[in-house]
């Protein structure tokens, strides 16, 4: 089912080249202009999606099982895992629907697009929520439990899910407006800036705190420098993974708006599945960064799995 011209759906139809670039792509082939297209085997795509599903299901199951993990922080981590689960699951389902030519199955496309878009928005929102939660736990430590109560966290979670579903419905309905794509790009940049500012501030505070301890105990400065380097490396990895996994997808949305007829942009459009694969990779990495580092959660996972040592 070719999806050229006015893109029929916000996410599903982005797995194609706009009309203007369709003819230009043929011209590029005639002139011999190089165009790098990275093929992603369906088996690899589905395997990554399956790994993401298993990982995030384990996170949700562990948090649901252990009452000690029923806190605002783990509430956001659980919802991040759930949204990541939906991201990978909906993309796998999307791939299956696109591969099926039956008209009845194709009618599910709009529903799947809304699910995919809303789960992506939720995933970004919960990454930001986790950053805010950690920021409050550091800079308002004495009042943290009165500020970030579980009911407040649950209300924030409900608001994020409702806002994401409503926004996704509007985005899918008005998919052919450039403003829709720009809103998504601006939202991604806002989350990136929010996370960068909060984590950089937390790192700066941690370095100052470590320096104060060093002065108090009269230790050697190199220890502080080593701590700062480790913290900077951790921050670089955290934000770098976020940007590398999500950035190409939103770069493509930006190019769809600003250069739909450019040959170079046309080459980028052809790698849509690569960008989705990077997002799936992010849903695999998120549990490793935010969930599996918790000793309590790992202990609960051992009980859930009922075998071996975690």
Curated annotation (Swiss-Prot):
Belongs to the G-protein coupled receptor 1 family. It comes from Leontopithecus chrysomelas (Golden-headed lion tamarin). Gene3D superfamilies: Rhodopsin 7-helix transmembrane proteins (1.20.1070.10). GO terms for molecular function: melanocyte-stimulating hormone receptor activity. It is a multi-pass membrane protein. GO terms for cellular component: plasma membrane. The keyword Glycoprotein applies. PROSITE patterns: G_PROTEIN_RECEP_F1_1, G_PROTEIN_RECEP_F1_2. Its main location: membrane. This is Melanocyte-stimulating hormone receptor. It is found in: Cell membrane. Receptor for MSH (alpha, beta and gamma) and ACTH. The activity of this receptor is mediated by G proteins which activate adenylate cyclase. Mediates melanogenesis, the production of eumelanin (black/brown) and phaeomelanin (red/yellow), via regulation of cAMP signaling in melanocytes. The chain crosses the membrane at residues 38-63, 73-93, 111-132, 156-175, 184-203, 233-258, 272-292. Interacts with MGRN1, but does not undergo MGRN1-mediated ubiquitination; this interaction competes with GNAS-binding and thus inhibits agonist-induced cAMP production. Interacts with OPN3; the interaction results in a decrease in MC1R-mediated cAMP signaling and ultimately a decrease in melanin production in melanocytes. Residues 1-37, 94-110, 176-183, 259-271 are extracellular. Glycans are attached at residue 29.
